[in-house]
């Protein structure tokens, strides 16, 4: 290591997916053929980096996620070889797979090495066999039995292999027999390297207290004489070692704290020291040239060390092959005026494939007929496959046309877009009933369909028109007053569980009371649940989205490590995934609750089963008792004989629940008295039952699944008594008798609902739904059950028998929720009286940035009250571009619309002495990649949203959202232009009585046009706003837009008081049609910004393109004002309350009142 050696570069290992967090590198290695550095991660992915700049070159998923991390990487002239616990994989350096090897006896691979033959490798691990693999053929050529568990391998004069007990074996390179063995370290070998005749090892020894500690010595062995040499002292703890590739006696030794020592093994007193800036080092690797050193640390970074003037990885490297530069296509003058035959067709000399003769067309590979689901429960295993009795539903030798069956499979027909309905209504306004009938033709989602009763259980999918999601008719899927949740959001498979938690009154109360506290932690899942539950209640049947909550859920490293995120569900059933998410949600709720109330037992009383676990050694009878509290109980099933299931009372749901709470199991465990593993008995004793009993169905065998098929097996109510440390559980007639007898200590639980997995093979992929008895959480005192199906945004009422029937093979229960009967209808809204409004009256910043000078915080005298008007405007940036599918006919279908992120929030006073003065002007910290700042329209520039570089006041999304949520629940009335778009992107639901949208105030009933704020400002006040600045880095000012919307509202009030609203609107639209609804040029120069698509009649300046509708007679759901004088504006709004559209507008010389 020369004097100028230092850290040259530090890069994070790329995350496993675009929305994931960086992960640590489980192994790193320098390529000895090309100028590449390779790294593997814990998701089975290997990534390469090119040159000293570590430019990302290739990234390949080499092993399934379920196999865990990449353990080691080796290099061959033909490619790169990697291993995980259960497979060996080889790729080319460009990322193409060469071969992939698995074997029944490959269970836990740890290491590999080349043998004496350069075209063969040997792989080993903590298993009973080693395997020799031919690299050229990609096959296993030999299997070798071994008594040792090997964790590391290095090849030199011998094949040096380290065991998991701290020994190092020198193996023969020919037959792999043990030539010599050393007990190198007391506990384990952490790292080792061999080169020439020397072997150096680092490892751990056991302290007197029993915990391992890094040895302060690096052991050295002579492979020529097979004898140990004097060790190398390293007081910081020798954790990692690498031999220099050129200097045979020089070694790099490193500690876990980052201390590096370059030492001569023959002269330990001659050494050089360096200190790497790491919190915890995970490994080092030296390049074949000896001029570069890579360090892997626990903060997911890879550091590159070396001399800036000399660094290179290999002395002679093959040229790295990069992707070919795509030639630019020739310029073609493509316009409607140019005939297509001018372009011409390529010359051909053979017959075209499109002219394939019809007599050579054959139908092959017809899919087999599906198995009748009614016979699946009766299948029995045979010598080959399974068999069952013939149900005799078809004729003998009858053949089914499976292709025709697949093409005529009934599906849930998507409704027409709202814009299509609006156009049809304008053409045929006298037949609204016919239009509704046409929209609903072919499918019904409530009740039993004539074609297929399973349609309501199908996957539902949002279709997008050019106007975005607001053009989709959600009311087609939901005619109830309960809101559904949208899909097309990462991890939206949890929608069903979130709906279930919302309808449990006690959990709903906890979440809302917590959200009303001073908690502003970004990762607080309980706050996000409170916001979501409040939004679902205020929506009153309109569709909602759990964007903010799911974004918080995705940010948890624990959720990613446990494989709970959508990207990790490839090899995992949805049933087991949602049960794991249920455990995670409730555990995280408990942590979030204790963050504000650490000493409160309220959460334990409501959710936790207070219990203790006793573990008794069956040999010495020693017993250990420890707490065994749990938030979720897993059902445990005994051995089941279906012939006796109906008559055997031990197989009733109540008895299985009792055995699950008082679980008892036998297994082997460590006994500190016997000082060995002994057979032990674990028994759980419950001391207090919770108010909310959450259960995971845990169906893990066909026998357990058949138990649920018994009609009425799942009761709608159960009774539990804790008596003398035992749990007694009752159901059915037994429970009714004890209720009549007023049994002391009896706790009655009602079934609130359940989450079920729906897996209908002919109805797309598996998904989750929830069945919920909404009467439990209703505010009206009623005892009749009202069961509803929640299938994402499809919500419909079902009867109790259908909800609790599981004799269909495609419907399986996953999560159950019971609540004490005393808490029925206990919907607590007192949290609104205890809102912590501190956030509205004090500054909060991530970067101590300075807000705009005009912003003045609210004073105590200005505390908002119900009806207080505030002006709102927001700005957004693009996080993802729209995904568009171009069909064969050239038409385009929007598969997924663009995704926006909140970037700025401005809120102004709407009344008082400081009317129009902002009291909130926050820029939002955005952690996701931003694909477009849309500076011209948002005014947001690169760096504005980064707390490290932004000159503005930066706050987390949670803080900005909570401020708006507080204003909403304080009863403020929001004034703005195109508020529907702002509210949707902020992900907040505002009742119609609390919105004043100037887009609807200045709307003419007979005009198919929504006027832009820019045009209205000129038309009413003769003022120019949103003008194109001289500097392209400038853009809209949200404070200016909010203030203009406020002024327009005030002016509209003047028009109403004067009774001239109709006259004003007529004049505005008459003059606007002459000017194209744009302000005239200032001084003859056009200065108005024009968004793309301004030629379209239905537009939206607030960033939300939605259609308008000419039918305004039934405008029941448009935004309105809180004043009685705004009845006319209600009549001017379109149905569904979601239409808003930009127009580019202009007109009019000012108010006629002047």
Curated annotation (Swiss-Prot):
Region Disordered: start-end pairs: 1092-1154
UniProt key word Hydrolase: yes
Cofactor(s) recorded in Swiss-Prot or TrEMBL: a divalent metal cation
Region (Linker) residue spans: 316-451
GO cellular component, one term: PAN complex
The protein's enzyme class: hydrolase
GO terms under biological process: mRNA processing; nuclear-transcribed mRNA poly(A) tail shortening
Subcellular location, record wording: Cytoplasm
UniProt domain Exonuclease: residue ranges: 870-1048
Domain USP: 452-821
Primary site of residence: cytoplasm
Extent of Polar residues compositional bias: 1096-1109, 1132-1141
InterPro entries: Exonuclease_RNaseT/DNA_pol3, PAN2, PAN2-PAN3_catalytic_subunit, PAN2_N, PAN2_UCH_dom, Papain-like_cys_pep_sf, RNaseH-like_sf, RNaseH_sf
Extent of the WD repeats: 20-59, 102-145, 276-315
Cofactor notes: Binds 2 metal cations per subunit in the catalytic exonuclease domain.
Regulation: Positively regulated by the regulatory subunit pan3.
Description of its domains: Contains a pseudo-UCH domain. This ubiquitin C-terminal hydrolase (UCH)-like or ubiquitin specific protease (USP)-like domain is predicted to be catalytically inactive because it lacks the active site catalytic triad characteristic of thiol proteases, with residues at the equivalent structural positions that are incompatible with catalysis, and it cannot bind ubiquitin. It functions as a structural scaffold for intra- and intermolecular interactions in the complex. The linker, or PAN3 interaction domain (PID), between the WD40 repeats and the pseudo-UCH domain mediates interaction with pan3.
The protein's name in its UniProt record: PAN2-PAN3 deadenylation complex catalytic subunit pan2
Organism: Emericella nidulans (strain FGSC A4 / ATCC 38163 / CBS 112.46 / NRRL 194 / M139) (Aspergillus nidulans)
Taxon lineage: Eukaryota, Fungi, Dikarya, Ascomycota, Pezizomycotina
